[in-house]
Amino acid sequence: MGKIIGIDLGTTNSCVSILEGNTPKVIENSEGARTTPSIIAYMEDGEILVGAPAKRQAVTNPRNTLYAVKRLIGRKFEEKEVQKDIGLMPYAIVKADNGDAWVGVRDQKLAPPQVSAEVLRKMKKTAEDYLGEPVTEAVITVPAYFNDSQRQATKDAGRIAGLDVKRIINEPTAAALAFGMDKNEKGDRKIAVYDLGGGTFDISIIEIADVDGEKQFEVLSTNGDTFLGGEDFDQRIIDYIIGEFKKEQGVDLSKDVLALQRLKEAAEKAKIELSSSQQTEINLPYITADASGPKHLNLKITRAKLEALVEELITRTIEPCRTAIKDAGVKVSDIDDVILVGGMTRMPKVQEQVREFFGKEARKDVNPDEAVAVGAAIQGSVLSGDRTDVLLLDVTPLSLGIETLGGVMTKMINKNTTIPTKHAQVFSTADDNQPAVTIKVYQGEREMATGNKMLGEFNLEGIAPAPRGTPQIEVSFDIDANGILHVGAKDKATGKENRITIKANSGLSEDEIQRMVKDAEANAEEDKRARELADARNQADALIHSTRKALGEYGEKLEAGEKEKIEAAIKDLEDAARGGDKAEIDAKVNALSEASQKLGEKVYADMQAQAGEGAAAGAGAAGGAQQQAQPQDDNVVDAEFKEVNDKK
């Protein structure tokens, strides 16, 4: 059985890890980096770039370069968070037939899981290159506050990428695993994991206990905001730059997608620089042009200015911390360690706010970029049976229930319930002789069902005619270890039953997933063919270059017919290399190799002759030197000669 890899599928960056024995290993990608930008570019010729190559070309291809797609996964187009992003993203966010938020790229509509699958495929390939064997199984992390639709969509992304997703695990829980497995402290410890990433914020309170030599990780509570992260911090900087430039130059950059892409890059860079310095300069020549000529952008931003711009965003993270502490039934003073996860936690102001709230410094021995992937790899080794000394008890982040009479949300499973879990409750009909009931499933904390997120609905039909309130319909909720919900309804009188795995009444259908899997496989084949064609062209170019060079130096030593044959073979190979037929290129490479065999023999003979002359000249020079030396100092040479004889 192959390794189960751990993947942190991030909004801004992604990371992959495995366990070697008991030691976690974060794997470097093909560019040599331990994290990969979650950026995907769709090129004109059909090529798909992922990671650093996609990021490098974003400025010149903003409409077809997708980033922060995780913010759209499992969401409806009409949601206010999605509507907010439509005005900010340089790429098109469109409404799918099922009402989901999809993206529009080069005249095609793509589902967010399909786009995220490209990043997962890159992570899969990174692990395969390192391990030297195929990888088919993974543990993928999601924000703890992801709802059922978002978890399901992430699982779908894994399937499209060719991965069997063994477990969906919460990011803060994964970070706690990475932290806890590394420590040898005895006794129970309560830790707070504050996770502020590129697009999401989570806070989890977790208890780590030693139970008979087994480390038990129990999540006491979790809270967060799935639309708050580094992307929002970047946007505050971008808005500030646009405002300042408009005041100074009278030009609105927000309407220029090329300028926006350059501003996005500059804002991210400035934000990172201001974590270690007090001031930075944004310098973007030729940012735009008007009738008076080109315009240049030059602006200084201080750390204090950045902190003022994002203060409200940082403050927004504190309320979920209060709620999580309250829900866990602990006091702030009970927290033994605070762990910071996510790139945004490098910002000094974020660290200061966390310190003020928890009354202690956060741990500095956890890598905020890698801890989540490492934790996922540890969970992978637990699932594969390689580790048996770890028990993980996670929770469902939001309450689950159904709509009952009057539009009320009747909760079946409360938030922060340890998963997996089951719950059943008996309901009845609202009307006399009602032949069917519709079960509408919701997730959230509001009292009225419409204030919560609707996950799906289904019907139970064939109820025997009876007065209202008489039939007994048992509704059961079952949450698996991935946090994904299965709901059933059963008429106790007739035994009629209906069960579904909740897939938001949007989400991807099985047919759509299968089609995307096939597309991905076809793309992988196409990528392989494209790479083989590129290799063949490179080989052809190298052979043409070396043959031409040899022909220039040794051509006059060949007969005219031989020379013409080689030149014709070069031309044939050049023509083939311009085409797209790898077999044709290979055939012409062989033809040129055969045609230039005589030339190769001439080159080899010439090199041997040169080497022979060099050796002879060297020997002659040494002999001459010896003869010259003899008359000058005959005795020394004789004495040396006799001394050698004596030793024999």
From Swiss-Prot:
MF terms (GO), sorted A to Z: ATP binding; ATP-dependent protein folding chaperone; unfolded protein binding
Residue ranges, annotated region (Disordered): 612-635
Pfam families per UniProt: HSP70 (PF00012)
Residues annotated with Phosphothreonine modification: 200
Domain of life: Bacteria
Keyword annotations: ATP-binding, Chaperone, Nucleotide-binding, Phosphoprotein, Stress response
Reported induction: By stress conditions e.g. heat shock.
Family note: Belongs to the heat shock protein 70 family.
UniProt function note: Acts as a chaperone.
Record HAMAP family: DnaK
Protein's UniProt name: Chaperone protein DnaK
Species assigned in the record: Cupriavidus metallidurans (strain ATCC 43123 / DSM 2839 / NBRC 102507 / CH34)
Gene encoding the protein: dnaK
